[in-house]
Amino acid sequence: MLYPELLQDEYCRDTLRMIKASLEKEAHAGRLDIAGKYTFLIPDMYAFCQWLFLGNKDPSGLLENGEVYCRLFEGGKELDCLRSPHLYLEHAVRRNMAGVNDEAKRWFQTNGIYTSCHDLITKILQNDCDGDKALVVEDVGVVEAAKRNTKGIVPLYYEMAKAGAKPLTPENIYSSMIAAFVGGNIGAISNQITKIWNSGTVDNLDAVKLLCLENNFTIDQSVA
């Protein structure tokens, strides 16, 4: 240490105590320090423009199936894309094309993660393209674990109800806000899933699937 006398300073000692306590608390919580970032999920807007302006019903886009573009990470590497917290096995390992595709670099100019129009990644992650975020991880250990544990796993798919169209009136806005505050409580459902995963013996994945379905229905509940 360059300045050992700093250890005698009361402020420095208090700061070190707080740092130590914080590290111990995180360790007790079982949190993993991994190389990852939260970022927005964005569709391939080049493909959207092909459909919108050129009338192409089957656009090629700039990304192939199994590819994503995220300039937060080195290109050419595999990334684990997941929702956090994830409930079932929503891991999508995809190849990052950042820095590899020059045309994509010209079009994809934000720090979000862009997904291919040929990919079922939105079904795996159960995300919409309206501000949903993903946890994107480049840690090799996590990527390999995700690939290993999702072999043979198919995405959960179910038809969700959709609220009927209503005019934007003060009364309808008010009733929607009331419904959003009264409903949409996913904590109890998520906790039940956590208990199953933490039991040490996950014998019935169907229970997790059904609870995940209920959780997603609760999040996107329809307001009649």
Task: Show which residues each predicted segment covers.
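Core catalytic machinery and nucleic-acid-binding channels of phosphodiester-processing enzymes
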Residues: M1-A224
